[in-house]
């Protein structure tokens, strides 16, 4: 299902020439993204291009600054901000990534290209629920919840770069009653070939 219009509130599009030289960045945010039929108009001369997009990159992330005509696509990186403790215990803004390589603009007609986005953030929720308070009780604060992963530094192609071991811990712990509790934490993307 297309979650763009309901979950994405900011888009940054990076445009590169066919050789990967940075040309410019174009951004949009706000209610226009939530219409369900959003299109970003990009004015380009005839030629071949590469497009890369990060969506939802707000205060939780740092993206490298690029210089037009100088920087290359390999210079574009995103890093999750972190304290010296390497503990991430706040809710992250949902982050999305997409790219299109080898786009050929002929200039003969209006041309539409679709950038499919994949989500780079995960929310993990633990729900503890007993049948009643008399037969089963749990104190959600009596446990430690943590995901350790070095997945907070992303390359232009969304691959993971070498990173610190980050400690993802709960940003929300709620004891509903003696038999129910909720714990939420988040992390950046998981990969099947990596152990967390």
Give short role names for the model-derived ranges.
Residues 9-66, 136-196:
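Tryptophan-paired
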Residues 21-120:
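Short, low-hydrophobicity acidic/polar segments
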Residues 2-6:
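Short consensus segments that form the blades of beta-propeller domains
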Residues 1, 116-131:
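A short, Gly/Thr-enriched small/hydrophobic beta-strand-prone motif that recurs across taxa
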């Amino acid at each position: 299902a297309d979650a763009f219009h309901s979950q994405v509130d900011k888009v940054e599009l990076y445009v590169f020439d066919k050789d990967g030289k940075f040309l410019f960045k174009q951004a949009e945010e706000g209610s226009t993204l939530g219409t369900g039929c959003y299109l970003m108009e990009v004015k380009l001369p005839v030629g071949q291009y590469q497009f890369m997009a990060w969506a939802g990159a707000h205060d939780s992330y740092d993206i490298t600054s690029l210089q037009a005509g100088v920087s290359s696509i390999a210079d574009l990186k995103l890093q999750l901000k972190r304290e010296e403790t390497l503990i991430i215990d706040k809710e992250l803004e949902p982050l999305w990534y997409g790219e299109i390589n080898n786009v050929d603009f002929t200039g003969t007609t209006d041309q539409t290209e679709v950038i499919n986005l994949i989500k780079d953030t995960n929310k993990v929720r633990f729900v503890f629920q007993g049948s009643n308070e008399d037969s089963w009780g749990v104190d959600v604060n009596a446990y430690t919840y943590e995901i350790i992963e070095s997945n907070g530094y992303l390359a232009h192609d969304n691959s993971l770069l070498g990173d610190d071991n980050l400690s993802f811990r709960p940003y929300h712990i709620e004891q509903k009653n003696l038999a129910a509790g909720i714990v939420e934490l988040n992390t950046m993307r998981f990969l099947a070939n990596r152990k967390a």
